[in-house]
């Protein structure tokens, strides 16, 4: 089976023990049998679509992709998280409902819910938004919290989570 993955998913493919694969931002450009890509992406070939926004999603994605090879057990997957303290900490959802935020974008919504912040449309203290929306936000009294989007962060999902969560942890 010829596997094609995107650069953002390559680390999960490696961790899962798959060695024979092709990396292309546009998997349909390759003559592949199967693609591993982010959930918001679409391809014509058979695929697994994974989410990598939160530690929980990353864990489940590693578990799913590893089924294509020799399935990793929970302890083997957790071992990859030990070098990343925020990834390890947020493998379980938290309750930080005292932090009230308005959030823009689905990928940030996943993160905010995982961290246990309360999502509000009114009476919020912070507006959390992806960097590509900076010029589209209205003036507000709330504190703006800019989070790097996919184009502005590491391809490694652990490093990406650490960076984003470290910004948001300052709100607690």
Task: Annotate the PLM regions.
Residues 77-85:
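A nucleotide-sugar donor-handling region in carbohydrate enzymes
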Residues 1-3:
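Extreme N-terminal starter segment of soluble prokaryotic enzymes
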Residues 7-55, 85-172:
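Binding-cleft/active-site segments that stabilize strongly anionic ligands or cofactors
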Residues 36-43, 50-78:
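A basic- and aromatic-enriched beta-loop-alpha substructure that forms the phosphate/nucleotide-
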